[in-house]
Amino acid sequence: TQESPDTAGVVYIVEDDEAVRDSLKWLLEASSYRVELFESGEMFLAKFDPNAIAVLVLDVRMPGMSGLEVQEHLIARKCDIPIIFISGHGDVSMAVSTLKKGAVDFIEKPFDQAALRSLIEKMLQEARQRKAKAEQRSLNDALLSKLTPREQHVLERIVSE
């Protein structure tokens, strides 16, 4: 079944190197992903949709705001977008720091294309599942709020048994 653009998800790529950005776009669009490119962390934070089903492929070292700073901004906004860091000059302590703060992976350039595609697909699938569960919780809450006090009492009795 073909997924709609809203449920298929988007891959955000934040990378200052145009050649790397373009090669990632080509690689992922060839696999039918919807891709949005940003050359800086500031541009990404100004334009991304925090409610989208998405994965963020984020360069660590960029002029202006670093990838680490972008991650901090997303944490402060309570945005749980999966982040895959990419870096040409990463070190172990940097990788550990990003992972402890919730990044999904830390990949060194040049990276294995098949492994990156597989990781992105896994993260988008998990994001779709999280969104579906959140929507179901909202629907359940809306239905529960419509119960009369008597119906709420009966439900509480049933659940407690």
Language-model segments: what does each one mean?
Residues G9, D17-E36:
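Two-component/phosphorelay signaling modules centered on CheY-like receiver
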Residues S138-E161:
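Helix-turn-helix DNA-binding segment
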